[in-house]
């Protein structure tokens, strides 16, 4: 076993630029299955300012599919998630907003969209695309993941092409088509794209990962 580490970030120093991480504001819209996992990963890698936006309340199924604890049942998701974040690092400036996303909440920095409906994604995107520096959208249906990233005009155009009508979206409710392990993998892919962006590396605009078929397609 190695010696005692006095800096908890030392083992990721070459992969996650600490200074840029500290100066960037991160906003997670929707702290359900994917959003909660992303928020916890961001806390672990050392973000300084983190906003959580969600109007929903933790219920029994969220313990299984989203990783909330039994004692959080009945609490606002943003409050429960904020508590978990502060248990990782009490110095994080975490702002829980128990509400639906409002255009006034659009901000510079990184916006991570983890809402259920295509129509909601489109509305949030319209409010954020002229303000945020990096946009990441995580989607999941059963064991199929899609991660979309936009940081430049070409990637903006590609992202907007995925905002099809809600009637064209895959059917299936978030309760019947969600697993914690798929959400955790999706969150890891999204956090990796944030790490690439922080390092000035090219982002992947579109990642499709079918876990059951063990197939991944990157655009």
Could you describe each region identified by the protein language model?
Residues 1-219:
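Adenine nucleotide-associated cytosolic modules
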């Amino acid at each position: 076993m190695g010696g005692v580490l006095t800096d908890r970030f030392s083992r990721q120093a070459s992969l996650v630029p600490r200074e840029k991480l500290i100066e960037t504001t991160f906003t997670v819209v929707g702290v359900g299955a994917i959003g909660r996992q992303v928020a916890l990963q961001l806390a672990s890698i050392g973000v300084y300012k983190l906003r959580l936006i969600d109007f929903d309340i933790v219920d029994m199924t969220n313990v299984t599919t989203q990783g909330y604890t039994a004692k959080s049942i009945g609490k606002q998701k943003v409050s429960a998630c904020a508590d978990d974040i502060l248990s990782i690092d009490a110095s994080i400036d975490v702002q829980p907003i128990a509400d639906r996303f409002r255009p006034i909440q659009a901000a510079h920095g990184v916006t991570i969209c983890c809402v259920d409906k295509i129509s909601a994604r489109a509305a949030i995107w319209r409010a954020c695309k002229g303000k945020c520096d990096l946009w990441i959208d995580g989607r999941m249906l059963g064991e199929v993941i899609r991660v979309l990233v936009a940081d430049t005009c070409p990637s903006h155009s590609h992202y907007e092409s995925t905002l099809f009508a809600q009637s064209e979206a895959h059917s299936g409710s978030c309760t019947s088509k969600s697993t914690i392990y798929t959400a955790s993998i999706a969150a890891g892919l999204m956090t990796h794209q944030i790490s690439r962006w922080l390092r000035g590396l090219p982002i992947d605009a579109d990642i499709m990962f079918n876990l059951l078929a063990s197939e991944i397609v990157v655009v």
